[in-house]
Amino acid sequence: MHIQELKELAMSRIDDLIAEYCPDGVERKPLGAIAKLYRGNGLQKKDFTDKGIGCIHYGQIYTRYDTFTSQTISFVDKKLADKLLKVHPNDLIVTATSENLEDVCKAVAWLGGSDIVTGGHSIVVRHHQNAKYLSYYFQTLDFFQRKRAYVHGTKVMEIKKDDLAKIVVPVPPLPVQEEIVRILDSFSSLEAELEAELEAELEA
């Protein structure tokens, strides 16, 4: 099985797992009913420093981060950080713009121990759910089909904060979310192992 097929299988498992753990059905709510959403501003790559307050630039979410992270690869000085949107532990950072539909709403869950900051073209989702569960859900076909109704643009695709808040998401009980995350994490670990093996074979 190819790595991409494995990833798609893992994401498709969310619906199966919800059906398994919630046989009587699962409550679905607009994202805005379970979270507060905030639009970022400012922050350019030229603002990065070697140390300071951790930051995640929206462009890095496409290329440098996966489903979740507890460390940032970039920093800004405190003076600038004070002007930027704060990201609390357990928040999601979601891309608001991209050149293609697939990358709009790409999410990374912030699992670090302290606040960081983000900037323009990012939406912070503050909630009381399992952050990794929500971040995984943002990768599903179900979410993709729902977001299409709200993404607009041609050369540059964009979603507004208030429209992202309208997207309906499944909200199983927290213990179910945790079990789903445990299973999907195991898929991700297997995917990482396969990628490492493939790289080793190519270098051999």
PLM region spans:
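A short glycine-rich beta-alpha junction/loop motif
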Residues: 115-121, 152-172
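Sequence-specific dsDNA recognition surfaces
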Residues: 33-45, 59-91
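A short beta-sheet element
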Residues: 57, 81-141
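Short, solvent-exposed loop/turn positions at domain surfaces
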Residues: 20, 42-43, 80-81, 111, ...
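Non-catalytic DNA-recognition/assembly elements of restriction-modification systems
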Residues: 17-41, 204
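Amphipathic alpha-helical segments
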Residues: 1-11, 25-27, 165-203
